[in-house]
């Protein structure tokens, strides 16, 4: 059974503060993901579950409106029926589950879909060598991005949620998704693709999806540059096959005035912390990358992301990000892309 993109997950860590002056870093936290797709345009958020039983679970969205002001909205789910939000968001910062523990997958998704339509024949569950797939309507593959959420709305297999993890490599208008389908979609399945965040039930309950470098800010013009640090983990959740000769790659730099670099912890399952998010890790890491993307750092010896029971506590590779904000840098709706590469059978 090969390691596929479905198996490779970026998790958060124990201490991911949103203010300065408190400890940052620590051990991997499997209930936190750092992967989502931002709003394509400012707008409201819809809240939904894949299970009709989710009538007491809540989702809290924190984000910025079009003026850059922080806003928070909490909604109680009504099962598979969409709950429409009222607050407009331009950028999402975090989505946090609360209330009764969710029975199904739950999501906060943009009310305005990126695309919608009827699927083509060709969706599939993982074969062990390829990930689960979804076949979009003709021509839509060029309009979607990794991280966006597919919500099936009718036809075969309605009320399913999955996150896009790859948009190339599997055929025209075919995207890879992060989990198997309960019912594989077919040519009758209707759907939307949306920005937002998916909090999966399996292989473990995700309760938080958040943006790295949440709520950082530059010094005033004429002041000093500020450097912030954030820790995440790359994990291989394949239960049978290690990812060998593994590397972590900064694939796409953030736009705007900031500069992102990264370093790897020299041991798996690292628990190191820093005094606050403006303090650099002093030991137990490789050198930080330098320069524009793409930048690659090989996983330190033995060089593998091991297999193990998902979520895989046997081999989480720590990643420290550094983000330099020059004084006077204006707020910017931007993102960056990290990837994991390696060899598999």
Regions inferred by a protein language model and the residue ranges of each:
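Beta-sheet-dominated interaction scaffolds and their linkers
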Residues: 18-32, 204-237, 248-249
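C-terminal interaction-tip segments
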Residues: 63, 110-116, 329-345
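Surface-exposed interaction patch
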Residues: 222-287
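Short, solvent-exposed loop/turn segments enriched in Ser/Thr/Gly
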Residues: 26-27, 224-231, 315-319, 330-337
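Intrinsically disordered, low-complexity Pro/Gly/Ser/Thr-rich segments with frequent PxxP/GP/PP motifs
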Residues: 267-275, 292-329
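Small/polar beta-strand repeat architecture
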Residues: 71-146, 151-212, 221
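Short, acidic/polar linear motifs in exposed loop/turn regions
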Residues: 181, 236-240, 327-329, 344
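Short, intrinsically disordered N-terminal pre-domain segments
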Residues: 1-29, 181, 344-345
